[in-house]
């Protein structure tokens, strides 16, 4: 799985390098999939020990989606899971210090023959719904305006007007338990150097930070995010995953149900304030360049 999903994907390799720096000193620095040396050293006994430690009723959340009643679900749960005895290994909510903010700016470059399209990215220290729900929601709206699609500031400026990029996006990992990165990323148009692309991207970001958003832009972003959350309810499996992950992170059912209204409540001032807080000129970041390299792909 690691060879297929990571080692064979230059973009994911670079991202793994960046996240290791971003989360240095935090448990997130340890990747879930591990490295090849760790995987090769695992034994069946290691797997069984992990299973016994964590795969117990005390550490489980059961989410059932579909045309069923609570009574039917309870009967089925008692039939299939009731025989599984508690193991006494309940871990409860894990608590540790927040992700330490970046204290210096770094640049990482990764080249690979498999790369067909260069890309430029900046990773900033962000936030999460668990750590700061209000800031997280405001950041979601702000990044939607800044780089959330073809109507965003970055796309219109870099792709449509200046034609220095073929893509330009911003997004943040706000659904982790602890602080995830907030990203600005773009791919250059043919013949455009990464340093010229970077200058164009950051000029637009700085313009937004200086001038702010319009009410119309923020209203459009709010409505889009709220609508996406509502349309997602059409998928039973998606809602099961959403409820399960929210509960596992310490959230509630109400957090999921109230999300559309929470998006609509974000003001223009909150949205631009979140962007300024995360992408301000005084904030450190990790810049990542993904480049092609000569050789066999």
Outline where the language-model segments fall.
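Hydrophobic side chains in well-ordered alpha-helices
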Residues: 73-76, 154, 197
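Zinc-dependent metallopeptidase catalytic helix centered on the HExxH motif
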Residues: 135-137
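A common structural junction motif
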Residues: 79-88, 202-212
